């Protein structure tokens, strides 16, 4: 029940200021079903990339209308050349040729990302049929990071036991440094706030408050200090973010364990943002 309520609340918020979102995986029925659900709630204006005739046939087969949905086939798009030229200008210093740029612009993830860069869309949802690398690479090359001085990481939202949790980083950085872990903690906190979640961040480890030792423990402990220092900056000091660590997963999530292992922690036992080392 909570999962449905959580999704409904997100759709309701989105419908108040609908954005234009590109869906580059129009060949996947799950994407088309999701597009119908979002469009029916008027939560976004959607652009689906794929074969228009096949997509129209699928919608007709299900008796769905296509209001607020635009279909584009990159191979025949009138914008293809301008997008290819844009990509060439952005990447020529890296050795990209005009021919390389045109080939890449035909890749649906690149095409969708170039739409955003050109101002023809606000965002893109991808990854159902593409690897993380193939999904993220165009964004890193074309859009780039919002914070140039910080590392790029990923976060996922999981709803369990009527509560939302955010996990980071489960897809991009394999062995994060202390600074990268601190960056993850702050970036995930920002994500939580955007979803209406007041972040209580646990920096996970196999140790809780010095119960274990080793290089990994030191890394997480130092990352926690870095993140807490970053919280004092002008950007974050007035935001309701709490970060604590190092702590084991049971201490982060279980209130009984938390009272034994970290009784003075404001995060232990009630963490909703988990940073994996």
What does each of the following model-derived ranges do?
Residues 3-268, 272-277:
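Anion-binding alpha/beta catalytic cores of soluble intermediary-metabolism enzymes, centered on
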């Amino acid at each position: 029940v909570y999962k449905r309520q959580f999704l409904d609340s997100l759709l309701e918020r989105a419908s108040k200021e609908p954005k234009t979102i590109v869906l580059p995986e129009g060949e996947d029925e799950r994407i088309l079903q999701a597009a119908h659900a979002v469009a029916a709630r008027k939560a976004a204006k959607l652009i689906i990339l794929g074969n228009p005739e096949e997509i129209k046939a699928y919608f007709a087969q299900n008796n769905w209308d296509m209001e607020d949905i635009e279909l584009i086939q990159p191979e025949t798009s009138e914008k293809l050349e301008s997008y290819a030229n844009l990509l060439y200008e952005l990447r020529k210093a890296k050795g990209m040729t005009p021919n390389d740029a045109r080939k890449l612009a035909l890749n649906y993830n690149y095409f969708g990302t170039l739409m955003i860069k050109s101002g023809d869309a606000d965002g893109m949802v991808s990854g159902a049929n593409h690897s993380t690398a193939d999904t993220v690479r165009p964004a890193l090359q074309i859009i780039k990071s919002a914070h140039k001085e910080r590392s790029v990481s990923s976060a996922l939202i999981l709803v369990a036991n009527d509560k939302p949790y955010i996990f980071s980083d489960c897809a991009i950085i394999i062995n994060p440094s202390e600074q990268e872990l601190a960056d993850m903690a702050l970036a995930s906190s920002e994500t939580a706030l955007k979803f209406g979640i007041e972040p209580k961040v646990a920096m996970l480890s196999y140790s809780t408050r010095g119960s274990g030792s080793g290089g990994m423990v030191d890394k997480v402990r130092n990352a926690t200090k870095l993140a807490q220092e970053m919280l004092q900056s002008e950007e974050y000091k007035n935001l309701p973010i709490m970060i604590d660590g190092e702590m084991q997963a049971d201490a982060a999530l279980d209130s009984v364990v938390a009272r034994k292992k970290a009784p003075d922690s404001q995060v232990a036992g009630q963490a909703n943002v988990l940073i994996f080392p």
